[in-house]
A protein has these predicted regions:
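Generic secondary-structure signature for well-ordered alpha-helical cores
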Residues: 25-32, 98-105, 140-144, 175-190
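Helix-loop-strand module that forms the ligand-binding subsite of alpha/beta enzymes
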Residues: 60-151
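A short beta-strand-loop structural module common to alpha/beta enzyme folds
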Residues: 32-42
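Glycine-rich phosphate/pyrophosphate-binding loop and the adjoining helix
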Residues: 145-210
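Cysteine-cluster motifs in flexible loop/terminal segments that predominantly coordinate metals
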Residues: 42-72, 204-210
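N-terminal beta1-alpha1 ligand-phosphate binding loop
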Residues: 2-30
Length: 210
């Protein structure tokens, strides 16, 4: 079992990374492999609505999004992390997730289907709950079980050293990791018992005015 931990911060070893690192340590204790995927600090284009992904089965913009999607095929679960920028996720992680999830949708890929997911947010002070809500939208649109902790998944601090003082925030990260590991074991056991996946329905697409 392996969980991909996506760092949506431009800082590879900053506050968001510190939260993901706490998750990674706990997953290791639970005998679950993980990998921290850095989206980096280079500009990431938003979706240009070209529709090429439906034919190419990957994004037409060949960058870190396609690198992630290759890894995602083999991953069993996902945790995305973002610092708060103006009470929302960063522009980079928003563009990244827009394109990754839209590519999976348009290419009819099962890369995210019924794989557990969660997000964490990092801020000096506020905006975490709005960011948390924003990032969870991707999972609920993709039939992904959302893993929760004992509080909204947020850490606070203006530096990694500050985050390490946020004892409750770090505990939230550990509880989240254990809940993710437990769900993965439950899913694995269900598959071994031959419990079938839910019946799929063809997607209906309607406009609100019709």
């Amino acid at each position: 079992m392996k969980v991909l931990l996506v760092n949506g911060s431009p800082h590879s070893k900053g506050c968001t990374y510190t939260g993901l690192l706490e998750i990674q340590k706990t997953l290791k204790e639970e005998h679950v492999d993980s990998e921290i995927f850095q989206i980096g600090n280079k500009p990431i284009s938003g979706c240009i609505a070209c529709g090429a992904c439906s034919k190419l089965k990957k994004c037409a913009i060949n960058d870190t999004v396609n690198e992630f999607l290759k890894l995602a095929k083999e991953a069993d679960g996902f945790i995305f992390g973002s610092p708060v920028h103006y009470a929302g996720a960063t522009g980079a992680i928003t563009s990244f997730m827009d394109r990754a999830f839209f590519t999976a949708l348009c290419s009819n890929s099962d890369v995210f289907y019924l794989k557990p997911a969660a997000c964490i947010t990092s801020a000096r002070r506020a905006g975490t709950t709005a960011t948390f809500d924003q990032m969870n939208k991707y999972f609920s649109l993709s039939e992904m079980p959302i893993i929760s902790s004992r509080y909204w998944n947020m850490i606070h601090g203006n530096s990694p050293e500050d985050v390490k003082k946020d004892l409750e925030g770090l505990q939230i990260m550990r509880v989240l990791a254990r809940n993710m590991a437990w769900f993965l074991r439950c899913k694995e056991a269900a598959i071994e018992l031959g419990i079938a996946y839910p019946k799929k329905e063809a997607r209906e697409r309607t406009n609100f005015i019709q």
